[in-house]
Every structure is written in C-alpha cells, then in structure tokens.
Amino acid sequence: MAKQSNLTTPTSLPDFMYNVGDRIDLLKRVLKVLDNPDKQFKIIHICGTNGKGSTATMIVAILRQLNYRVGTFTSPFIGTLYNGIQRNFSDISKAQFDSEMAKIQHVMVRPGFNHDMLSEFEAQFVVAMLFFADHPVDYVVLECGLGGELDATNAVSNTMYSVFTEIGLDHLGILGNTVAEIATTKSKIIRQGNTTITAPHQRPEAFQILKSQAAAKQATFLSAD
C-alpha cells in the first residue's frame, strides 16, 4: 500500500497510498503550486460501488452531443495507462502524459515536498487535471478511485455535480464494514451548494445518508428514479 516512486516514468509509479497521512491536503498543496488547474473547468464527480464507468460514459456522450468539450478521468484504466485520461473520448498521448508528469516532478523537488510523496493514482489524477487545463474543456467527468472522503479526486474545488451510483459493500475494512459506513465515506464528495444526484433504487440506508449530507451542505438533492 505504501510503495513509493521517483515519478520518472508512468510504469515506475507506485500504487494507492490510502489513509497514509493527509493525502487530500498534500494534493491540494500540489495543485495550488501548479496554479490550481482543477479550477479551470466544471467537475462532475462520480462515486459509488457499481456502475461508475458506464455512468461516466453516458454523461460524456450526452455532453458531447450538446457540443461541450469534455475531459474524463476513470479508474482503473482498461488497456493502457493512457485511456483513463481522455478528452472528447480521445486518450491522452504518451508525450502529453510525460509533459504533465515533468511539471509534477518540478513541484515535488521543492522545499516542503519530496519526490516519493505521491502514489500512482495521485500522480495520474494530477496529470489529468493539468492536461484538462492545458487542453481546455468545459466539463470534467471525474471518477473516484477508492471511497470518497480520502480519495485523491476529492482534492478538487470546482464540483458542480456529485453523482452517486449504487452503493454497496466494497473494500470492507478500508471504507467501512457496513453499507451505512461506506455511504458516509462516499458522501463526503458532496460540496457546499452543489447538485447531488443519486442512482435509482439506492439502498435505503445509503439514500438517507446521502440526503442528510446534501442537506448539511445545502446542496440540491435529486434521485434519478
């Protein structure tokens, strides 16, 4: 879980580092030094146990039909490292990935940072944010990697929609041991005043937790029923 890397190439990147120190604060600091690329577009943040990838694909297809420029960050990657980062359904190229990685390397050697601080997923996430800022998009469809509250993707600032697919039992002992505990962790992607949408037929305990968190954040709460 805590394998580390010098961030030199995509294949040398480490695994997830979940709940190892304050990951969100670290990522926010990295993004700030990089001029907050995540603030350059509107974010649709997708979280859940099942159906995240298909939901992301449908949302991107709808937005493209409306002529919006759309970035997508999905996990796990299917096929190559690069097809988890797409702009208008086209993968980031190796040259583009390497160019954004070089910017991260320059940050991680600054005082207060260290080259082995980031995990694979965290570095890929920052690459995606930089890529979408450098190749402008209107929306980014952002898929959580693990959980919600402590997931790297929860470091973003400009979340317009928080979308929840079906929440069930996953990553037991890491995210929680019950649907309610897991839903609580995932609900933390809801942002103040945004729009929160839950999948139809959400489990009752998960539904109530999402609804309560949305109310606490003064977010509009919608069910796709």
Language model features with spans:
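Short functional linear segments
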Residues: M1-G48, T55-T57, A61-Y68, F73, ...
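N-terminal-biased segments
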Residues: A2-D22, N88-F89, Y139-G147, S162-I174
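Short, surface-exposed alpha-helical segments at coil->helix boundaries
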Residues: I24, D98, F207-K211
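ATP-dependent carboxylate-amine ligase catalytic core
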Residues: L31-K32, N36-K39, Q65-S157, G173-L175, ...
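Aromatic/hydrophobic pocket-lining residues that form π-stacking "cages" and hydrophobic walls in ligand
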Residues: I59, A128, L210
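Acidic, Mg2+-coordinating active-site environments of NTP-dependent enzymes
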Residues: P111-G112, P136-E143, T159-D225
